[in-house]
């Protein structure tokens, strides 16, 4: 993306690492952060191959990060393992019902997420705290305006990693 969410988190006082495969997007994120008087670190990386160190983040935030089905589960599990005990994974993504709207998102249903898919990806690894499917108003700039149908999922790594052996694999 272009850094809106990372900059917002930095404005709340969080240390932020924005990861994207686009150098252009990361440059825009850095420029937005500078314009708003906050700092964030950036990393150009492909989520298909990037492996963050285990237990290295307090939170992972995935906003409209749509991945092919073959990659989605592996990336979600890799990012879950990057959470420290008690860490949070927050995800918002378009649901297949988004195809009936013109407010953005992939046009390939296989790239859209359901709660069942997220539970299959992350169940047994993170504890589900919130799972929601809803229609929300979008106002994210050109091409992302109007109603959007999304899934929202919040999970927490167990306080003790041993409580979920999958975190150690």
Residue ranges and their predicted role:
Residues 86-94:
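Conserved beta-strand signature within the Rossmann-like core of class I S-adenosyl-L-methionine
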Residues 58-73:
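A short SAM/SAH-binding and catalytic strip from SAM-dependent methyltransferases
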Residues 15-20:
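Conserved SAM-binding motif I beta-strand of class I
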Residues 35-48:
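Conserved SAM-binding strand-loop segment of SAM-dependent methyltransferases
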Residues 73-85:
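A short glycine-rich, Lys/Arg-flanked "PGG" loop and its adjoining helix->strand segment in the class I
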Residues 48-59:
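A short acidic, Gly/Pro-enriched loop at the edge of an enzyme's catalytic core
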Residues 109-132, 151-152:
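Short alpha-helix
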Residues 22-24:
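Conserved SAM/SAH-binding beta-strand->alpha-helix loop
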């Amino acid at each position: 993306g272009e850094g809106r969410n990372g900059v917002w988190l930095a404005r709340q006082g969080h240390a932020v690492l924005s990861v994207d495969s686009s150098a252009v997007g990361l440059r825009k994120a850095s420029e937005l952060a500078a314009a708003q008087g906050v700092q964030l670190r950036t990393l150009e990386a492909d989520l298909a191959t990037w492996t963050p160190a285990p237990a290295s983040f307090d939170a992972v935030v995935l906003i409209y990060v749509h991945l092919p089905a073959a990659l989605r589960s592996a990336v979600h599990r890799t990012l879950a393992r990057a959470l420290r005990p008690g860490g949070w994974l927050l995800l918002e993504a378009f649901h297949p019902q988004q195809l009936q709207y013109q407010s953005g998102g992939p046009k390939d249903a296989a790239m859209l997420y359901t709660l069942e898919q997220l539970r299959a990806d992350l169940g047994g690894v993170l504890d589900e705290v919130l799972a929601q499917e809803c229609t929300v108003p979008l106002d994210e700039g050109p091409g992302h305006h109007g109603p959007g149908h999304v899934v929202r999922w919040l999970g927490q790594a167990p306080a003790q990693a041993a409580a979920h052996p999958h975190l150690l694999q």
